[in-house]
């Protein structure tokens, strides 16, 4: 709009949890990071970064780990679970990129300083152990490029909720 008429825009992205969906090109940006580091190292790095930024007190420790250690997984399990986390990261990346485009458009139009932005999401990392889709007759539903991996699992969910316990479907800190 070129005038100062108020407007309302509701922009809804699919929440970054099951069913996880992202473009393969975006997934590729994150796969190696998660495959190489695994959840143990990622969790430690996120905790340190939050403490360094003052988001959490450096004295806050980690919640008890309730999952297998990354090094206990087979190579095939590491490949599979790293891919699932990369799909999640790609989905968040896409949302972040496009929200950035919207903000840039508001800046260019001179409307950003007179705009109220609410960013809302659901309540924490999703750990539901949904399985791969399969067995159906509708090929578009059973297409990995469309369905991605329905969930990234409990270990990545607990990593995402660092330093808190559990995940969103529990009445814990996650």
PLM features per residue range, with description:
Residues 1-174:
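Active-site-proximal cap/lid insertion segments
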